[in-house]
Amino acid sequence: MSFRCSVCGYVYEGEQLPDNYECPICHQFGKFEEYSAKKEEPLDSKEVSGPLDLSYDSQIARQDESCRYMKEIHEMAVSGKSIHSSMGTQMKMPGWDDILLLGAQLNPLPLDDGEEVNTTTVIGKHAKKPLIIENPVFISHMSFGALSKEAKVSLAKGSALAKSAMCSGEGGILPEEKAAADKYIFEYVPNRYSVNPENLRTSDAIEIKIGQGTKPGMGGHLPGDKVTGEIAAIRGKKVGQDIQSPSKFPDIQTKEDLKELVEELRIASEGRPIGIKIAAGRIEKDLEVCVFAEPDFITIDGRGGATGSSPFFLRESTTVPTIYALYRARKYLDACGSDISLIITGGLRVSSDFAKAIAMGADAVAIASAALIASACQQYRICGTGMCPVGIATQNPSLRARLKGDAATQRVANFLNVSLEELKMFARITGHKNLHDLSNEDLVTISREISEYTNIPHA
């Protein structure tokens, strides 16, 4: 008999479905139903010489949560392959909930409810054509390929309705997405997808991707089953061909090389802000190179951010947590007298997180998972399989059809607009008429660890 998962379509073959069976693809319980499909008649058993069955005896196999990585070791032992996982780590980390905002009472005084708060955010204040947005929270880089066309366009439309910005991701420019966005940040990657004079002139900012938090030092990978004709055309690849991005720019070997690229892009874009994105690792050493290159903005991607697919143990064992990364980056830039715009990303979810990050010194916040959740994401955490049941992280036409673009657009806009209003609320209750006047003086922490390794005092 066959049983098919109603969520992701995985088919289980067996005489009987085990009780409380967990789907190995989407990890859902109780979602299987009987399934019939035409099959070829099996060959005589004597003539069949199949591969060695490495699965553990189901009668005695078990999982012990107290045994560290038992499940993962079993999986690698049977498959002979590294484990890849989607979204961000679920390991415990220093969290934004351990930081608290101090409401003003008498000294200082709070603002009245409804009093106007300035939220205008300028990225690249010294650029010839700075990027100006009314919402300091924008949608981070996620590629067309990892995400469906419908997801990308609805995110762009939602960001436009919220007077925010949309990022291209490393897969090049999807024209419909760029047209839908109010402000558009183009990601410049080693493969140079969509790099031409027109795209450089018409993007509102350009960001050089050096790394990302979930897989620092590693290039991106898009499996062939996600490479449709449209994606292949944008990336200059063959349909169905696996696409691997280099882990570094071959022509950036020194800080002088990076500075030269920044200047080339600044000229080619006719003065748009040029940024550099790095994973939070050797923060001060990397920032030394970045500052020398004189970009208009720097993005720090901290531990806690997400990805469509990353080697599991790479994701679990790398990158400085976002709170510490932001503190160290702000401290370094202040120490060297730099006013380069600082953008933080990596695991920030809601308005209180955004307000705390701005108080710690971020000029803007880039979000990915939160925007996807607002759109339609239900956190099945199977993005890398291409079987996303809500139509976001897939190129399967029938699954893509499940994402209702207009509704997704409005949900994203609602989330960003509500977040902006709540940011204004946090500014008022701390006594600030300008959101960007939030500072370390408006924060305390209930974490001894955070108080010891940042400049946030303990409550």
Model feature map: region roles:
Residues S2, N20, T385:
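Residues immediately within or flanking Cys/His clusters that coordinate Zn2+
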Residues G14-E22:
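Short linker/helix segments within small regulatory modules
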Residues S6-V7, P24-I25, M387:
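Short, cysteine/histidine-rich loop/knuckle motifs that typically chelate Zn2+
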Residues R349-H458:
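Gly/Ser/Thr/Ala-enriched C-terminal appendages of enzymes
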Residues F29, A37-V137, H141, A146-K157, ...:
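Conserved, well-structured core domains of diverse proteins
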Residues F249-R400:
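Glycine-rich phosphate/ribose-binding loops and adjacent secondary-structure elements
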Residues V11-E15, F32-E33:
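Short, non-ligating residues that shape and space the ligands of small metal-coordination modules
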Residues A127, E134, H141, A146-E264, ...:
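Active-site-facing alpha/beta catalytic cores
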